[in-house]
């Protein structure tokens, strides 16, 4: 029963992280900072929620599957985020500072 309440607490922490990441996603000005907010949501909050659901789950096989999914997300999401950031850098997507400097110079 204690594991159930720990799982609920961990899921609440994960949901708080998701909502704060969503707020950051809408408030950040350019692609790269929005990419950072999205990767924090996917790399931190989703695995935390999955581990919380694994604590709540009574069946051991389902708990192992949830923990395995959380580990895969923790390992693979930073690679995907890096590839997306590098591709956008190679495509020369401008940052907020360069756009702001061009407005100031005019």
Swiss-Prot record:
<dbReference type="GO" id="GO:0015385">
    <property type="term" value="F:sodium:proton antiporter activity"/>
</dbReference>
<comment type="similarity">
    <text>Belongs to the UPF0091 family.</text>
</comment>
<protein>
    <recommendedName>
        <fullName>UPF0091 protein RP266</fullName>
    </recommendedName>
</protein>
<dbReference type="InterPro" id="IPR005133">
    <property type="entry name" value="PhaG_MnhG_YufB"/>
</dbReference>
<dbReference type="Pfam" id="PF03334">
    <property type="entry name" value="PhaG_MnhG_YufB"/>
</dbReference>
């Amino acid at each position: 029963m204690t594991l159930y309440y720990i799982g609920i607490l961990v899921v609440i922490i994960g949901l708080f992280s998701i909502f704060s990441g969503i707020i950051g996603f809408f408030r950040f000005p350019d692609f790269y900072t929005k990419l950072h907010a999205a990767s924090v949501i996917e790399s931190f909050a989703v695995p935390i929620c999955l581990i919380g659901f694994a604590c709540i789950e009574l069946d051991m096989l389902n708990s192992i599957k949830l923990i395995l999914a959380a580990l895969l997300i923790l390992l693979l999401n930073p690679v995907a985020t890096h590839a997306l950031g590098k591709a956008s850098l190679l495509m020369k997507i401008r940052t907020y500072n360069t756009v702001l400097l061009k407005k100031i110079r005019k």
